Amino acid sequence: MAEAHKYKKLTPIEHVLTRPEMYIGSLDTTATPMFIYDEQKGHMVWETVKLNHGLLKIVDEILLNASDNISNRSARMTYIRVTITDTGEITIENDGAGIPIVRSREHKLYIPEMVFGHLLTSSNYDDDNQNAVAGRHGYGAKLTNILSLSFSVCCRTNGREFHMSWQDHMRKATAPRVSNVGTKEKNVTRVKFLPDYERFGMKEKKISNDMKRVLYKRIMDLSAMFPNIQITLNGSSFGFKSFKDYATLYSAMTPKGEKPPPPYVYESKSGCVAFIPSVVPGVRRMFGVVNGVVTYNGGTHCNAAQDILTGCLDGVERELKKENKVMDTNRVLRHFTILVFLVQVQPKFDSQNKARLVSTPTMPRVPRQDVMKYLLRMPFLEAHVSTITGQLAQELNKEIGTGRRMSSKTLLTSITKLVDATSTRRDPKHTRTLIVTEGDSAKALAQNSLSSDQKRYTGVFPLRGKLLNVRNKNLKRLRNCKELQELFCALGLELDKDYTDADELRYQRILIMTDQDADGSHIKGLVINAFESLWPSLLVRNPGFISIFSTPIVKARLRDKSVVSFFSMKEFHKWQRSNANTPYTCKYYKGLGTSTTAEGKEYFKDMEKHTMRLLVDRSDHKLLDNVFDSQEVEWRKDWMTKANAFTGEVDIDRSKKMLTVTDFVHKEMVHFALVGNARALAHSVDGLKPSQRKIIWALMRRSGNEAAKVAQLSGYISEASAFHHGETSLQETMIKMAQSFTGGNNVNLLVPEGQFGSRQQLGNDHAAPRYIFTKLSKVARLLFPSEDDPLLDYIVEEGQQVEPNHYVPILPLLLCNGSVGIGFGFSSNIPPFHRLDVSAAVRAMISGERAKSVVRRLVPWAVGFQGEIRRGPEGEFIAVGTYTYCKGGRVHVTELPWTCSVEAFREHISYLATKDIVNRIADYSGANHVDIDVEVAQGAVNTYAECESELGLTQRIHINGTVFSPNGTLSPLESDLTPVLQWHYDRRLDLYKKRRQRNLTLLEQELAREKSTLKFVQHFGAGHIDFANATEATLEKVCSKLGLVRVDDSFDYILRKPITFYTKTSFENLLKKIAETERRIEALKKTTPVQLWLGELDQFDRFFQDHEKKMVEAILKERRQRSPPSDLLPGLQQPRLEVEEAKGGKKFEMRVQVRKYVPPPTKRGAGGRSDGDGGATAAGAAAAVGGRGEKKGPGRAGGVRRMVLDALAKRVTRLLPRLLF
């Protein structure tokens, strides 16, 4: 009970006075750089002034009350008058609608008395009201009253006048005086107050000169926001006729007297945006106002305005690229100051301070073309624009432009993989051709198949590795692409040369020879893109300079030993349909390496038969820009979304000898794009990518489920499922599917036996595939019941049935495990959710709740995570690690966001150590638990929010989903996962209906067979069948006569029984079996599809409840015990924030709950207000010996002295807590 006196309950007024920083910011005066108006220079300057945020805020609250009255259209407002006396008394008066002078029926108080003298009174609580005002929380003017020595108000509204005054920080008040005045008297609201300057640290008890300048600038900002209202300070107006007048004040001459260009200003009803250029580059600065509120910390509106400018600069950059120029956008941005003044409906700020806008702004529709034209006129732009035909192009020409003049010997030594044509003489009968192959195996096929005569005028060059996209003449990227450099060198090309024909090159044609798959299409596209980007005239003026060599993808061998070749799967399938009764065997040629040398000789025997000439038109430049330019993301998204659902087929007629760029892009490149997305993006129903689906399917059909090495299993899976993309990628996929640590998989479909990775590196620390074992986990068959298998739609590859198009698990696995993937133009980042919450979501759907309502209650989570999920300022989710802050600066970190590895955290701490924020780290973490001690430097963090931010203990969780819908089309979901839940629910319920009907049919067929068998046995037992003299024909006649059921058009299931089947024991067993089958049929008839689903969900839930319990126990067992409460600093501990109330769905509550957003606290002492805190004592000791705050002395001696004092301060800081406690 001795500690009871420490606990106090404060009144609201006492709380504001005791903790004012929670409401208005710091009361301390600090040196703050900001825009300020310089009366002598007549324009704005960026200057450091002594600013008191709290004093500015209480004045601002009354100013904003006045400006909010502008939106009240019941009476026109014409002026706001501000007066500041020498003693510091401030008066703010405005006309307009005024405050109603009536008593509240509910509270029996006059409305002005409530508005100015009772906390939490406001007229802005109606969120349906579309007024653009600054007030929101009901504190405003009351905070000014509480923090003032005197406060009085006079309201004159509609013929009545109200007077009332307060003293002693709103604790004492006079009685309200109400009188009648003439109805013609103008409405007025006048507030007069004297701030408690001493409380704001101003010993002279009056306003400082710097604060007068700050308030002058603040009132000037308000005048710019509302130029139609006469706003004056001490009787003087600012004279702004428009926002442009105000924006011009930010333009300043250089020290050399250079005049800056005029600002770009755009004004609209929703606000104004200005881009103010400066001749000399500086630091990027932005200044924003929302409904009169100056957002000193920026916010979403400032970011949006900068995005507009950046987007326009990007547009300028694209235009310059067409002129063979490049621009340094970041350097150009440093020339601009951005102003954004917005009028917003119901704006949301990060706190009562309103220093940062967090809601999505409605920006003025700035005409971007006008801004681009404006930017192109900037005189400083030229300094940041350069041609790419400068030094880099010259250096590259030295490497790739001298090939034409190189001797064969020089080429032999410089490009070792080039097999050059054996003759250098030109033959008019034959075009000198360079065959460009995909890899060495294709090179071998070409080289081994060419005849001796063909080798005289044909060279071969293999492309190894991935080519780079050099669109827009990106020579920096070209410099990093050795493959293209050597190709251009072999051809003898020179950069920036306009070729009229190809005769001056070493080869007059290149023939691209790649695999007939999506990767081959990509290589063709990159080669075409490189030549069209760097030498467009060469392709336009020389049709067929780039040609495509096609080889069969399928060969069908008929009974007469004739062979039919097919160059596309579409062509093959068409032939199959028209020759359905023709017997044949087929061979698939996915890669060029499949072809034999004999087949290769056959191809090259008639080379032109297999060659398609590429025709390029000047208009194709724009189309290739859309496909390969990094800026054209939206076009590519639209391109692929409009494409048909992925079928795995290329729709190009290979019989034609000409191929246009348009056909290539829309029929072959789109094939690569869709295949790439199919590999990278998950299916909405089963949450799997094709490689994962192949692994599951192959392991399910594997006999037995014994663990095997990952390296061995990859070979089996690759063969069984017709996987064509290398066993290494398959092994990596298997390892990821087996990872079960926090942040790995919430549901691991494979079992990890060995080192499959840990939280140390988020799985990247796994052992080699040849050392680790895996097998299918038990949960796989819980999610994918074997009874589903016959009802799924399977893919046919190379003539064999492989994995399903997609599985239909009992839960949407995409929500359980999440999915991350980067495709072609699309990406996906879906976080995982608690698997039992996903189960509860499905149950809620079954009970009739709408998917949208259910998804709103789902909160991201990783199994084993010991932290919490908070709501962010913009409604997003934030994963937060856990720590305890101990005396002496020791921070015991016990959890990290699951997307942060322990190693990444250690690297971050190492960086903080270089900044003197952290002194040391002790890591006790294991494979799946976090246990780290960090010693933080004294004074480095002052609030829990700073501690979380500095140590990197928070991580925003982004939801941006693009998935394949049930019908196979790309479906961008953005942040709404409702379709995933709905699609899965529809498909799974439909599958249960089909499964129930199928099982019922199978049971009825089984019962008919059993009853037929019983009837035959009874007939035999009665002596009606003489087996000794019967033939098969007579027995079949007996069965037919008895009306027995046939199976596969025979009675073998009865007639092939062993003699022991006719014993009494077998007869009794048969009767029992029939009774059991009848019972199962009746039970299944009474069971609905929903009941089947719920039964399987129950099994899943029981399995994972036990699994999670064991996992959490193991984590807690490994971790060290927490520090005792006596060692903790209360002021720096993480708060237990209030849980958001879930809307609807009370029947199915979620395990994971999100905590409400609370604005981060402002700075305060590390140890709170307690005098006994070790942190506070250490800070005082550090200050006593010099510490961080001491100014540097002059010269070398001062620097040495400071180093000694700093070292001494650190030692005292570490030792004092041990001595005192």
From Swiss-Prot:
Coarse class of the protein's main subcellular location: nucleus
Cofactor binding remark: Binds two Mg(2+) per subunit. The magnesium ions form salt bridges with both the protein and the DNA. Can also accept other divalent metal cations, such as Mn(2+) or Ca(2+).
Family per record: Belongs to the type II topoisomerase family.
Protein name: DNA topoisomerase 2
Feature type site, description Important for DNA bending: 822
Residues at which Mg(2+) 1 binds: 438, 515
CDD domains associated with the record: TOP4c (cd00187), TopoIIA_Trans_ScTopoIIA (cd03481), TOPRIM_TopoIIA (cd03365)
Organism: Trypanosoma brucei brucei
Domain Toprim: 432-546
Gene: TOP2
Region ranges (Interaction with DNA): 952-961
Extra remark beyond the main annotation: Eukaryotic topoisomerase I and II can relax both negative and positive supercoils, whereas prokaryotic enzymes relax only negative supercoils.
Subcellular location: Nucleus
